[in-house]
Amino acid sequence: MAKYTRLRYDVTEVPLADLVREVMGEEDLEGLAASDRVATRETDQSTPYHRRFYDNVDVISPVYRTLVHRLLGDEVDAVYIQRIPTFRVHLRNSVAVGSWHRDRDFGHDPSEVNYWVPLTRAYGNNTLWIDEEPVHAEYGEVIVFDGANSWHGNVVNDTETSRVSMDFRTLPRSSYEPNDRKSISYGLPFRLGEYWDTV
């Protein structure tokens, strides 16, 4: 059985989905058009939806940081957070992440903790899988898991809805070691002020 913790937050106080709908210019995130091809590791971050999200990260960042404060509470001063959250779109007939992986296989520190934040319903084959188990979640829930060391990924979405989510990682400040390895999603070095930040 996959190991994870389920947290909840108030979506009226941290309206992430509303903000993402606004910056993407999309009324219905679950209704995003089906894909005509299955994404790969090289293409899973290159849809027009991703461009709109990352082009507006300065608008999203304050609400993202509010979420981090709500989730971490007093622990926020003991960790570094991923400066720019990773955006995921699991379109129908495609995948959100091009390959099953453990984050450590891509240069991430083994002591990192992953926070997966669905902005739509996540169920059936449109959801995140951890250690070969689908993790169902609703908007307003956050799944916390050991993505550095646990196999995770997804399968082709054969549901009737697209899934939109974001995720981020934390790193204990005591484990931080500056290095020049780069994140696979957007090529940022795993350094403070680049990939990592304080809240």
UniProtKB/Swiss-Prot annotation:
Residues making up the signal peptide according to the UniProt record: none
Protein name: Streptomycin biosynthesis protein StrG
SUPFAM superfamilies, per database record: Clavaminate synthase-like
Pathway the protein contributes to: Antibiotic biosynthesis; streptomycin biosynthesis
Domain of life: Bacteria
Function field: May be involved in the formation of N-methyl-L-glucosamine.
Keyword Cell inner membrane: no
Biological process terms in GO annotation: streptomycin biosynthetic process
Keywords: Antibiotic biosynthesis, Streptomycin biosynthesis
rRNA processing recorded as keyword: no
Organism: Streptomyces griseus
